A protein has these predicted regions:
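Conserved alpha-helical scaffold segments that buttress catalytic/binding sites
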Residues: 1-186
Length: 186
């Protein structure tokens, strides 16, 4: 709602980008909870929406309050792609953080630090089972770009799985064009 109130729709139209608010998911009135149950509920709803949009071949954008919305977004996309011949999700994650914690490795318990681990099938089963009961991303089809702030546990998980990671240092050394070209070819 805040984005609508701040004229986002008008600004998109000014740039000739078609837009309409198909679905707005929001916590219950006054609910500031980031509880596991509420995150699962919202992401299950979001997965159903993105699943339907992929099935209808509709482009979409998801604007969320934190990274936990990636769980529902990409779970729905992966579920839809799984029904298509040779359909498999590939993802380029551009972020300073690896977002690959589980409840066992996080110091904070913040679910917004867990979406990639969840999408890879690691972590709480109520999160990993959203939309389809299997990992959503093959680690060989996941590339992280721009990481610079992460914990050892996250890095160990991703390295063990063979995820390609380009740190900010790699971007500075090799150049953004080279990194993106390699990521897309991966």
């Amino acid at each position: 709602m805040q984005l609508q109130n701040n004229r986002l729709e008008q600004k998109l139209s000014e740039h000739h980008l078609p837009n309409h608010w198909q679905a707005i998911l929001k916590p219950r009135s006054g609910d500031k909870s980031h509880s596991l149950q509420r995150v699962v509920e919202l992401n299950t709803e979001l997965a159903a929406i993105t699943y339907d949009l992929i099935q209808q071949h509709q482009p979409f954008a998801v604007l969320g309050g934190d990274h936990s919305c990636a769980i529902g977004t990409w779970s729905g996309v992966a579920a839809a792609l799984a029904q298509q011949q040779n359909g498999e999700l590939g993802l380029i994650w551009i972020d300073a953080h690896m977002d690959s914690h589980t409840f066992e490795t996080t110091a904070t318990g913040n679910i917004h630090g867990m979406p990639l681990a969840t999408l890879l099938g690691y972590g709480d089963t109520t999160l990993t089972q959203i939309a389809i009961p299997r990992p959503k991303i093959n680690p060989k089809r996941l590339v992280l770009i721009g990481t610079r702030s992460f914990e050892t546990e996250e890095e160990k998980l991703l390295q063990r799985l063979g995820v390609r990671i380009y740190t900010m240092q790699a971007i500075v050394q090799r150049g953004l064009d080279t990194v993106f070209s390699e990521a897309i070819a991966y």
